[in-house]
Amino acid sequence: MKEKELRLALVLFGGVSLAVYQHGINRELLNLARASRAYHRVEGPAAKQAPGHVYPAGAGADAWTAEVYFDLLKRLGRMVDLRVLVDVISGASAGAINGIALARALAHDLSLAPVTRLWLERADMQRLIAPEARAGKWDKWYFRPLLRPLLAWARREGMLETQPDPETLERALAFVRSRWFSAPLDGALLSAELLDGLLAMETGSVAAGSLLPSGTCLSLAVTVTDFRGIERALFTHDPPLLREREHRHLLRFACEHRRTGELDSDFGLDNAPSLAFAARASASYPGAFPPARLAEMDALLAARGLTWSTRERFLARNFAHYRASGMNPAEVVLLDGSVLDNKPILAAVGYIRVHRAFREVDRRLIFIDPHAEARVGQGAGSDGGEGEPGWFEVLRSALSDLPRHQPIHQELAEISRYNRQIRRLKATIVQSRPEVEALVERATGGALSGPFTAVELRHWRLTSTNMLGAMPLVYDPWWRALVLEALDFLAGLLGSLCGCARESPGARWLQQVVEAWAAHAGILREHYRIADDVGEDADMPAFARVVIRFGIEYKRRRINFVLHELNTL
């Protein structure tokens, strides 16, 4: 039976109003992943379609819809053996909190019920106001009679979508009467709540293990905004080097479920402080919460007598370029990720491009927005009407709404161009197949269909490759592209060993040194040719040995091509 994977990449937008909605979607995605794992716990189509193959009982109170997804997969299993997994997540602000919780649940098959309680019971604004920022009995008393007409005016100006209810009025009054000119909400309390929620996911977990199938990985990226920024080098013609400050930053986490059964995870219990800090930093809305710094999490853990055993690993993975620039990560001040990147679609696409598969994949990129249709053709500061907007509406939209509601047209257009390029490359491969098969037939003398040895296969491969040498217009540029790709990998490897950040002056210098060495050693040349009778790698010319040892991307493409051919059998 045909095997297929449905791989989901999630983009969780920022916005506290989306938080609970996104969390509900995440619970369903978690149950879908649970159902897929349960369906594939047996081998073979007959066993999977057996009447006794049902979703296991007692799988957890929050997994009640998983049985529905299990039955759906079983019904689809009559036609295709479908496996479903979430392997890419990116998020900003409140979306980052939800993305981190979902990634941890997927990586270790944990419950999201504690996160549900976090949103519904612990995320109340009045709880999050810092004790020293709370209004006294007579603090800003004049807002009591003014708030209702003020909100009514804001509604007329288009600043509010609906008329606030009494509960909202009470919370709005508490907020506006709290401390001014300093963040009123308690950042340390938010860190504590996030840490508690992530730790509590271990309680009531469904089962030990992971929802990631063997041989797959899960990648997570959350956006943060570096208040001071970091210098980036730009290599231009004149002047040769420019510098600018980059304030956008991604915090990255990953989990790999190896085929040996081992789980290399950034989402384990010992990583909870790292995850809580990332969530706190990405959700530090300017003006409401104070900026996030590492010292806040250090103080919280010290007060509880806990350790942050993965702190150095977290910093090495996410702040290596800061250290390479002479900056101390402890001094970095982080703001809400939605300030500069509220919809991190390209971060998700970057992961999609490097995730490998062993069977046919149906890829879906999902961005969660409960009002997607309503927003088509509607600007961030518009109610869809006509006429001149109010003064405060314009000010609010310019300073807040418009920067946080940038359209995703460019990102989706880039994805469309990428998909179109893939389709064209596939069509080119299909059209060239007859000529390739004829060339291989001539090189092997028709012996490829019978038994052969590894030595014969090696000889045929060199012979067929060298037959292209009769077309130097194609052959030499092809070899040169392979050599340069291998040299890029070598330069990147040396750069990582030397602690050079990508695109840094040091990395640029290493690249130039490697290419100069390759030209001097005859690795970069005008013409490329390998003798047909070469028996060992050591007898290969220098350029071929470089490709054999460092042409990792070339080898990956070859393996992927073989896997694609096997899946078509």
List the predicted regions and their residue ranges:
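Patatin-like phospholipase
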Residues: 19-196, 236-245
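Active-site gating loop/helix substructures
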Residues: 166-181, 215-354, 399, 403, ...
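Extended hydrophobic secondary-structure segments that form protein cores and membrane-embedded regions
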Residues: 8-12, 47, 85-93, 125, ...
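Hydrophobic, mid-to-C-terminal alpha-helical segments
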Residues: 358-362, 374
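Charged, amphipathic alpha-helical linkers/stalks
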Residues: 365-368, 375-499
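Extended, Lys/Arg-enriched charged tracts that mediate electrostatic binding to polyanionic substrates
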Residues: 185-211, 216-219, 227-230, 341
